[in-house]
Amino acid sequence: MDQQSTRTDITVNVDGFWMLQALLDIRHVAPELRCRPYVSTDSNDWLNEHPGMAVMREQGIVVGDTVNEQVAARMRVLAAPDLEVVALLSRGKLLYGVVDNEDQPPGSRDIPDNEFRVVLARRGQHWVSAVRVGNDITVDDVSVSDSASIAALVIDGLESIHHADPAAINAVNVPLEEMLEATKSWQESGFNVFSGGDLRRMGISASTVAALGQALSDPAAEVAVYARQYRDDAKGPSASVLSLKDGSGGRIALYQQARTAGSGEAWLAICPATPQLVQVGVKTVLDTLPYGEWKTHSRV
């Protein structure tokens, strides 16, 4: 990192990130980054002999034996956040971390080749982003003010993989359990548009069934967005997950709606992925976190 430059981000590989963990005594970070856990030892003298230290000193990430304070501050946010917002993005179908490679060694920290992952972490009012692409992780400060700013980051990330216009469909809400059951049998038919009768009976239009079938069977790109809050040593996930899927019929957004008081039924929203509706989906994810207001909640 050139300290004379206006750039503030750093990029290291997984081994370099683990060395930063060792220097700062950080045991682990968000599991989506697929980093190795660090176990404290009596001495870190061995780090000075590691060839990666010379590289990080050249880049200004490490000064002497100490991590650059800006970098250290970001790493501490990643180590003990109040909140994390996670986006898993993929070209093609999202594999959710499953690497289909028989030659992959046990304990591998690889992620699928078609994926990249974004973790937005907040501690106090300090927001940090960590982006993993291949074997590299880029860490930087990030500006987050509301759900719209998070939605914009998600859309920008998806657009960097694949462009799609919002699908030309009408928004619809359907019972979640019924939708999951209907989709399971629909999948067995290869998402054939003529086999979507159960979906049509739920009030989903023929055009929406067609666009949804294209996006589910052969997506050009996907993203899943969810969040976690921390309280002391406990953590709690958002009840809702936002999914964006790019099919030949356009980009579709799906998310579980927040339950209303007194309602025992969960509902799924299916809608065109316009910026406004993506923002609604992100807001729903954040509103379904368990420990209160996402902007101000503190883990302690």
UniProtKB/Swiss-Prot annotation:
InterPro entries: EspG. Keywords: Chaperone, Cytoplasm. Pfam families: ESX-1_EspG. It is found in: Cytoplasm. GO terms for cellular component: cytoplasm. Its main location: cytoplasm. Interacts specifically with ESX-5-dependent PE/PPE proteins. Binds PPE33 and PPE18. Does not interact with EsxN. Monomer in solution. Belongs to the EspG family. Specific chaperone for cognate PE/PPE proteins. Plays an important role in preventing aggregation of PE/PPE dimers. Required for LipY and PE31/PPE18 secretion. This is ESX-5 secretion-associated protein EspG5. The gene is espG5.
